[in-house]
UniProtKB/Swiss-Prot annotation:
InterPro entries listed in its UniProt record: COX14 (IPR029208)
Species this chain originates from: Bos taurus (Bovine)
Protein name: Cytochrome c oxidase assembly protein COX14
GO CC annotations on file: mitochondrial outer membrane; mitochondrion
Transmembrane region(s): 15-37
């Protein structure tokens, strides 16, 4: 039978691990959103430049 201290240690480690995983997952989601944002921005910029050049001809 685990003692109160052992239960507290297990609870603390479980909580710490879950917070660490949430932080890593949040960072992943943030970086994916930033990547897609910059991809869309560059494709829009390229499309606008193509439209300018085709309109000038």
């Amino acid at each position: 039978m685990p003692t109160a201290k052992q239960l507290a240690d297990i609870g603390y480690k479980t909580f710490s691990t879950s917070m660490m995983l949430l932080t890593v997952y949040g960072g992943y989601l943030c970086s994916v959103r930033a990547y897609h944002y910059f991809q869309r921005r560059s494709s829009r910029r390229q499309a606008a430049e193509e439209q300018k050049t085709s309109g000038a001809l």
